[in-house]
Amino acid sequence: MLQELSRLNVADNTGAKIVGVIRNLGGSVKKTSNIGDIVVVSVKKAIPNGMLKEGQVVKALIVRSTYGLRRKNGTHIKFDDNAVVIIKEDGTPRGTRVFGPIAREIREKGYLKIASLAQEVL
């Protein structure tokens, strides 16, 4: 579960490395987000000459969470870090590569382009 002010790693090649959550989208009283949710983030650390600069505000999709996720078949899945993929307004990724594994729930929620770019779908 990720809340406002959480720091997240970026799992794509947009140039951002660390982002901070500004707002959880999906309702006025939504306090936390998990895998597959969209959040508004601010770029905290970025590489020089990258697509994104420090201080930019963008939308991102959560692809990994240390909190974990319970699936309908009873299994639990947890990751080693909290990570996001930066997306455009229409839900397509801004980068051209996605690093590390992502959860299968990303594909089930309709983000097929992100799932196809990922190295591994768990």
Swiss-Prot record:
What's a Gene Ontology MF term here? large ribosomal subunit rRNA binding
Query: What domain of life?
Result: Bacteria
Q: Which Pfam families match?
A: Ribosomal_L14 (PF00238)
Do you know which CDD domains this protein is assigned to?
A: Ribosomal_uL14
Gene Ontology CC entries for this record: cytosolic large ribosomal subunit
SMART domains, sorted: Ribosomal_L14
InterPro entries documented for this protein: Ribosomal_uL14, Ribosomal_uL14_bac-type, Ribosomal_uL14_CS, Ribosomal_uL14_sf
**Cleaved signal peptide residues:** none
User: Does the record's keyword annotation contain Ribonucleoprotein?
Assistant: yes
- Name the Gene Ontology biological process terms: translation
Decide whether keyword Ribosomal protein is in the record: yes
Q: What keywords are annotated for this sequence in UniProt?
A: Ribonucleoprotein, Ribosomal protein, RNA-binding, rRNA-binding
Give the family this protein belongs to, as stated in its UniProt record. Belongs to the universal ribosomal protein uL14 family.
**Complexes and interactors:** Part of the 50S ribosomal subunit. Forms a cluster with proteins L3 and L19. In the 70S ribosome, L14 and L19 interact and together make contacts with the 16S rRNA in bridges B5 and B8.
This molecule's function is given as: Binds to 23S rRNA. Forms part of two intersubunit bridges in the 70S ribosome.
Q: Which PANTHER family match?
A: 50S/60S RIBOSOMAL PROTEIN L14/L23, LARGE RIBOSOMAL SUBUNIT PROTEIN UL14M
HAMAP family for the chain: Ribosomal_uL14
> Which named protein is this?
Large ribosomal subunit protein uL14
Biological source species: Mesomycoplasma hyopneumoniae (strain 7448) (Mycoplasma hyopneumoniae)
